[in-house]
């Protein structure tokens, strides 16, 4: 905390029995004999605290809480938009109520369990992103399936070779056109097998 506590103020430590949080607050000297209501900024639980009883607590316990807040590194003054401390004080006597000025700082130390939970959340490894199949991979997969449906006896290697040739010979497929036709041409299901030219029968001339 950057601002130093005025000598007329006294630091008191209040334990929230609802969320197990230690609240460190500074109270002006003229309010030390009052019964105040402390609002926990962690769980918003209201606590009625007798400051006179806190002043008679053991000094060693106060020093322990102060040392714990310094080591945790989470101590700080939390203020709302109006400038008042987040843990508002009000003197709750039978006849009057008193709200402390903004100079009365309020600090909070989260429990060790909450610290471990936050560290575990930040230490999670980044999830691996699944790569989206490219247009080529999607086309080859669908083309092999189509070729095998039309020709069940074809091998996977031949179907893959034919699908790759269809991708190379029909570039408009790259732009999302129908895989069945491209420019009036039909996709090849299998590679054509060259055949020997057939002999033609020569008819003779009759005289």
Curated annotation (Swiss-Prot):
Listed Gene3D superfamilies: High mobility group box domain (1.10.30.10)
Source organism superkingdom: Eukaryota
Family in the record: Belongs to the YABBY family.
Zinc finger (C4-type): 16-43
UniProt keywords, alphabetically: Metal-binding, Nucleus, Zinc, Zinc-finger
Pfam family membership, one: YABBY_N
GO cellular component, one term: nucleus
Lineage: Eukaryota, Viridiplantae, Streptophyta, Embryophyta, Tracheophyta
Major subcellular site: nucleus
GO terms of biological process kind: abaxial cell fate specification; cell fate commitment
Alphabetized GO MF terms: zinc ion binding
Organism of origin: Oryza sativa subsp. japonica
Compartments (UniProt record): Nucleus
Tissue: Expressed in leaf blades, leaf sheaths and flowers.
Protein name, as recorded: Protein YABBY 6
Family matches, as InterPro entries: HMG_box_dom_sf, YABBY, YABBY_C, YABBY_N
């Amino acid at each position: 905390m950057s601002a130093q506590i005025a000598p007329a103020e006294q630091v008191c430590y209040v334990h929230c029995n609802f969320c197990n949080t230690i609240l460190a607050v500074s109270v002006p000297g003229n309010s030390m004999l009052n019964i105040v209501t402390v609002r926990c900024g962690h769980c918003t639980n209201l606590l009625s605290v007798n400051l006179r009883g806190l002043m008679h607590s053991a000094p060693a316990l106060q020093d322990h809480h102060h040392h714990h807040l310094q080591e945790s590194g989470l101590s700080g003054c939390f203020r709302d938009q109006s400038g008042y401390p987040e843990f508002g004080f009000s003197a709750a006597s039978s006849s009057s109520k008193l709200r402390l000025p903004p100079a009365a700082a309020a600090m909070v130390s989260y429990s060790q369990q909450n610290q471990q939970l936050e560290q575990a959340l930040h230490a999670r490894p980044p999830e691996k992103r699944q790569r989206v199949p490219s247009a080529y991979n999607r086309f080859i997969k669908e083309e092999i399936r189509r070729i095998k449906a039309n020709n069940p006896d074809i091998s996977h290697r031949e179907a893959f070779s034919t699908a790759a040739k269809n991708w190379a010979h029909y570039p408009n497929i790259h732009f999302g056109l129908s895989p069945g036709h491209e420019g009036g041409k039909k996709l090849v299901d299998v590679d054509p097998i060259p055949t020997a030219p057939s002999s033609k029968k020569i008819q003779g001339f009759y005289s």
